[in-house]
Curated annotation (Swiss-Prot):
Gene, per the UniProt record: apt
Entry's Gene Ontology molecular function annotations: adenine binding; adenine phosphoribosyltransferase activity; AMP binding
EC numbers on record: 2.4.2.7
Associated pathway: Purine metabolism; AMP biosynthesis via salvage pathway; AMP from adenine: step 1/1
Listed name of the protein: Adenine phosphoribosyltransferase
Length: 185
């Protein structure tokens, strides 16, 4: 059996992500993580790399942001043997929630989490498919901290390294890890 290095896994993952020009609007080069999901070897490699990085790190919960964060966060939580907590748009969670609003380029949005999903002392790993400006992840970290959880780490499949998200989260005391980096412009 051939041993695959982490660098080879990262290259496989990067090569599985399709770039779509002029989507969703002219001038944007969209990085399509759904093409990674279509490749079972690349998808498995992404989960394995994330799980291996955080195994034995003391993580007690994994939080995934709507919606593609669920696709990576839930399997990583299973691999780590910890619970998975979804962060969703308003009105999608059935139990009592708390919410956090955040600014977008043109307007604002809101995220919610079940108010009983995180306990004081939980060491939470946040996972999403992509880090761009960091607004969604900043709101997610604020929700977790309001419930008493600690967030030291956030992991992504893709980091659009020139859009400022990593710096934004680092400023909140969150260490960012991504499997692949692309320019955002």
């Amino acid at each position: 059996m051939m041993t695959v290095t982490a660098q080879q896994q990262a290259e496989l993952i990067k090569n599985s992500i399709k770039s779509i020009p002029d989507y969703p609007k002219p001038g944007i080069l969209f990085r399509d993580v759904t093409s990674l999901l279509e490749d079972p070897v690349a998808y498995a490699a992404s989960i394995e790399m994330l799980a291996n990085r955080y195994r034995n790190s003391g993580v007690t919960k994994v939080v995934g942001t709507e919606a593609r964060g669920f696709l990576f966060g839930a399997p990583v939580a299973l691999a780590l043997g910890v619970g998975f907590v979804p962060v969703r748009k308003p009105g999608k969670l059935p139990r009592p929630t708390i919410s956090e609003s955040y600014e977008l380029e043109y307007g604002s949005d809101t995220l919610e989490i079940h108010s009983d999903a995180i306990s004081a002392g939980d060491n939470v790993l946040v996972i999403d498919d992509l880090l761009a400006t960091g607004g969604t992840l900043e709101a997610t970290v604020k929700l977790i901290r309001r419930l008493g959880g600690t967030v030291n780490d956030a992991a992504f499949i893709i980091n659009l390294f020139d859009l400022g998200g990593e710096q934004r989260l680092t400023g909140m005391g969150v260490t960012c890890y991504s499997l692949v980096d692309f320019p955002g412009h």
